[in-house]
Amino acid sequence: MSKKIETSAITAGRPAVTPDAPLNPSIDLTSTFHSGGPIGYGRYGNQTWTSLEDAISELEGGQTLTFSSGMAAISAVFSILPIGAPIVASNQGYSGVMSLLNSFHTSGRLEVRFVDVVNTQEVIDAMKGAALVWLESPTNPCLDVADLPALISAAKKLGIGVAVDNTFATPLVQNPLAMGADIVMHSVTKFLSGHSDVLMGSLSISDPALFKRLHDSRSFNGSIPGPFEAWLALRGLRTFPLRFNKSQESAKEL
């Protein structure tokens, strides 16, 4: 029997069940590890991050990497694209992303084709020759909703990668990886962590080779989360379904 997402939020990312084992993961405040293991150094991994990453993976699917912020996660995706690569992106969305994409477009780092994500055909028409389709749905703050299944399907037929910012919808509402997306991004700062005391981002990735490239990007750029922040985010994740459902009820009432 598959677990409900509410159950996964409570149970995922916990230590193995053995006699007298702690229920919660430890906060591993270390920069250095003994040799011979898979981590090697504090910029490459940390057991506290791993617990949070395992939990997000159980909600979103794929393999997950956590980052020092949502913008760090987004920047990692763009960092693996060639200079001048064409991408398709919404003409309105999170202000940090819009500023970054406009900067990339002006400098020639990327060729950004800005589109209205509500206009499905406009987005599809802009895809030809693109290296990536970056989708935010619902958008922040205007709440524009893209037809993700149609857009992801169209991109896949053209062999184009798709990344979806799932921060506002969350895995309680939609699972873009299950629709065929390659990457799902979260500003963990917002709904997943939910207590306004953590800056963090995450990427959930469907392909192991792509996961490795993004893992290397994080390691080399140093855009890693702190172990205490990862522990706080995991604690916040335990109540995520309750908080999200209550916020929807409040929004309907208002």
Specify the residue positions occupied by each region the protein language model found.
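Short conserved active-site loop signatures built around small residues
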Residues: 1-28
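Conserved N-terminal alpha-helix of the aminotransferase class I/II PLP-enzyme fold
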Residues: 25-80, 96-105
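Active-site donor-binding loop signature of nucleotide-sugar glycosyltransferases
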Residues: 12, 31, 117
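Conserved PLP-enzyme active-site core in the AAT-like
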Residues: 15, 64-254
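Short, hydrophobic/aliphatic alpha-helical segments
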Residues: 5-9, 55-58, 180-182, 186
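Short clusters of hydrophobic/aromatic residues that line enzyme substrate/ligand-binding pockets
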Residues: 10, 41, 192
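Short, acidic Gly/Pro/Ser/Thr-rich loop/turn segments
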Residues: 17, 34-37, 210-211
